[in-house]
Structures are given as C-alpha cells and as structure tokens.
Amino acid sequence: MATDDSSGLECVDQGGHRGPGGDDPFAVWCEMREREGARVTLIQLYALVAKPRGLEPHELPLAERRELAARATPLMWPGFEYNERSKPRERQPVEVVAYDQGWPERFEAWRGRLVGLLGPVALRIEHVGSTSVPGLAAKPVVDIQVSVANLGDEDRYVPPCEAAGLQFRLRDDEHRYFQPPPGKPRHVHVHVCQQGAEWERVHLLFRDYLRCSAGAREAYAAAKREATRLWGNDRPAYTEAKTDVILGILDQAGAWAAATGWGIRG
C-alpha cells in the first residue's frame, strides 16, 4: 500500500549522483515525486519514458519496465533492500479471484503457528489486506501483519518466521517482509512492523473501513480489475496503479475514524 510522502527524496542516477531535471525522464519523475509525494507513481515514470516514443505506459517492453521499477523502488520505499540470503521467486502474473471463505481459516492456522513460534515477541497478529475483507476479490495470498516492540531487533523475530517455513525476503524503513521460498505455494505473506507506527495503523484502518463500507469495497474492487487488465504481468505497476483509489479511501477512512472513535483495539 503506497502511503509514504517520500519527503526529502533525492533524485539519483545509477551511479549515485544527483541529477538535474531537464529532459531526463527519471530526474523529472523524481522532482515530481519530491513535490507531490506518493500520488506520483511508477506509472507516471513509465508515461514519461513512453510518451516521446508514441506509446502508452503499458506498451513499454516489460523488460524496460522492470528496469525502471528496480531503479525507482528504493525511492518509493526508503530503506528498501533485499535480504541477500533470500532467493527470488519466479515471476507470475497477477491473479485476482473471487472472495474465498477459506481465507480466514488459513489466517487462523498461520496465526496459531506464528503465536507458537514468536511467543511474546508478537504483540499483535492481524489478518490484513484484501483477503481479510469478506466479499472482496483478491489475490489468493493471505497477508498477515505482526506488530513487534522493536522492528530493528531482527534476531527476535526473523528466526521464528523462518522456522515457520518462510524466507525473509526484504526490509525497508517501515516493515520486514516474509514469503514462502521458491518452490513452495505462494499462499501467505507476513509483514512485521513496529507497534504504534503509521504502517500498523494505516493497514488496520484500511481493512476496517473496507469491511464496513460497501462503496469503498466496490471502488477498490474496480481499481483491482482495471489494474489487472493493464498491469497483470507487472506486479509493481499493478500495486502502484491502485494508489489514487487507496489514498482516496484512506481519506474517507480518516474521517470515518474521527467520527466513530475508531482505534486499534487492545
């Protein structure tokens, strides 16, 4: 979920040097992102590269889009880095399916496993993402958010998550991400975050608002359908294509939270 404002962003080339704007699409995109924050997405970078060639963003060759995404990701997600011990999974097209009544059961099974392995290190274990919202179409992957007291103390939670059969794939300033290793079904993702941080709050608020707002659910479902149509073979772009709708829903959710007294339970 792209919600950072990326303040203080530096526009750098692949050699690590700050570049001017001018006609360089990447530098222009960086300046746009620095001014306007997360509403300037990877799709705009694709557009800046594609337009002079008479192409639509989704018409850029996939290999070129992947290079652009790899260059932009550290700027969109400060602190981003892959765990050098992890192995990349084979790239698969985005698949969005109808809501499955079995997703909550899958979450509960994984929750029990994580509780047993993490013990008191896990201050909160929550089902988040689209599979946590009854009736909402989703990628068939259960997202689990684990809140801890100290995100930087990886030795306390990385080994237990790995013992659950997950690999520690990447980190950024806000969370740590675990997924099944290559060769295993991709049916669960675990996101470890700092208790009380914005990452924790935003994902729980987004979930709870979608659960109670049919209009927000339909808007999000429509965004998913369109993103899949255009970007089904490009996972970073699929995620980024939903940004405007997500930020709009979060604005509504913020007003709803203020009106209802919503807060993180417990």
Predicted regions and their residues:
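Short amphipathic alpha-helices in soluble, non-transmembrane regions
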Residues: 157-164
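Helical scaffold of the NTase/Pol beta-like nucleotidyltransferase catalytic core
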Residues: 57-126, 247
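Low-complexity, glycine/proline/serine-enriched flexible coil segments
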Residues: 1-4
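Residues flanking N-terminal targeting/processing segments that define the start of mature chains
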Residues: 10-17
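Conserved catalytic core of two-metal-ion nucleotidyltransferases
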Residues: 166-198
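Catalytic cores of NTP-dependent nucleotidyl/adenyl transfer enzymes across multiple folds
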Residues: 82, 198-266
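Active-site nucleotide-donor binding segment shared across nucleotidyl transfer reactions
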Residues: 113-155
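Hydrophobic helix segments
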Residues: 20-23
